[in-house]
C-alpha cells in the first residue's frame, strides 16, 4: 500500500473541498467513508473482477484520503492506495494502482501548491 502525507496551511474544510474538486474533476467518485475519511473510486468493479487489469482506464480502483489536524493546527491529509482493488488485477493491477496513486499524489500536490497552502509532502 502506497501512502503520502500532505501538510497543509489551511482549514480542514477548505482542504476537503479542494481535494474533492481535484478528484471529481478527474472523474473519480468521492464519498464519505467515515467522519475523517473520504473514499475515492473509479472504474467498473464487476467488469474488473471478470477481466482484471485488462480493463484499462475502466479498471476499478479504490483509494482513501484521511483528514486530521497536526500539532500546530495545520491540516494533514493521508492519501492511501488500496491493495484490495489492485488484487483484482493481479500483478498488473497492483502496478496500475501504485502508478495511479503516484500520479494523483502529484496532481494533488500541484493543486495545493498552486493555492500556496502546501507546506510539505512525505
Language-model-detected regions and their locations in the chain:
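Ser/Thr-rich, low-complexity intrinsically disordered terminal regions
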Residues: 1-122
Amino acid at each position: 500500500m502506497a501512502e503520502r502525507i500532505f501538510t497543509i496551511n489551511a482549514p480542514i474544510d477548505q482542504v476537503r473541498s479542494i481535494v474533492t474538486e481535484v478528484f471529481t474533476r478527474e472523474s473519480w467518485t468521492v464519498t464519505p467513508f467515515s467522519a475523517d475519511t473520504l473514499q475515492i473510486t473509479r472504474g467498473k468493479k464487476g467488469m474488473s473482477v471478470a477481466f482484471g487489469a485488462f480493463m484499462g482506464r475502466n479498471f476499478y480502483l479504490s483509494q482513501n484520503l484521511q483528514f486530521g489536524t497536526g500539532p500546530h493546527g495545520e491540516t494533514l491529509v493521508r492519501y492511501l492506495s488500496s491493495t484490495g482493488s489492485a488484487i483484482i488485477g493481479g500483478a498488473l493491477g497492483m502496478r496500475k494502482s501504485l502508478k495511479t496513486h503516484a500520479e494523483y499524489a502529484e496532481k494533488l500536490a500541484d493543486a495545493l501548491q498552486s493555492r500556496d497552502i502546501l507546506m510539505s509532502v512525505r
